[in-house]
């Protein structure tokens, strides 16, 4: 009986230790700011030009370009590290489609603005499927939500083909900012 009781206690302690260690592992890998494409804010002048459906944002037919903004909110533990990565999930089926994303900041006290990261889909080949690509940068200063506000500005663009017809089908599915 004593061996069986000791074995049960050992198993219970091992399980408890495993459960206590699991959240630390999960939290360490799940610290990222994310936004679905359909949660962006569209300029008043672009309201009829952008469709926010399912999880994506896309241009309406006949529209050449539009701008969508995504507010970046503080995420505990995310912004403390030198290398920041901006990941963009987008649709670029042809050479007439372009998507770009800029991570901006504005200083609350002075109104000074600047760009921290820039993503340009023209660096990646067209693909009939949605693709996920990233850009990284070593940012000396960490995010400071007490002194600055941050947002990602996404541009969706399509261009005209050789016959003068507007072609392309840019879409944005998601954005993610992560610390590496």
Please give the residue ranges for each predicted region:
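Noncatalytic modules at the cell exterior or secretory-pathway interfaces
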Residues: 140-164
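Bacterial N-terminal signal peptides that target proteins for export
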Residues: 2-14
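Glycan-recognition and processing domains
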Residues: 27-64
């Amino acid at each position: 009986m004593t061996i069986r009781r000791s074995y049960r206690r050992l198993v219970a302690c091992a399980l408890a230790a495993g459960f206590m260690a699991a959240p630390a592992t999960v939290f360490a890998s799940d610290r990222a700011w994310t936004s679905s494409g359909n949660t962006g804010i569209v300029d008043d002048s672009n309201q009829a030009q952008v469709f926010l459906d399912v999880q994506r944002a896309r241009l309406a037919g006949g529209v050449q370009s539009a701008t969508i903004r995504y507010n970046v909110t503080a995420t505990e533990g995310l912004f403390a590290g030198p290398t920041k990565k901006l990941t963009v999930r987008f649709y670029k089926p042809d050479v007439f489609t372009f998507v770009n994303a800029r991570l901006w900041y504005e200083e609350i006290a002075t109104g000074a603005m600047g760009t921290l990261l820039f993503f340009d889909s023209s660096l990646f080949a067209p693909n009939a499927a949605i693709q996920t690509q990233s850009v990284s940068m070593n940012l000396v200063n960490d995010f400071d939500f007490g002194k600055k506000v941050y947002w990602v500005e996404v541009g969706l663009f399509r261009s005209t083909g050789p016959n003068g017809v507007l072609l392309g089908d840019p879409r944005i599915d998601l954005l993610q900012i992560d610390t590496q």
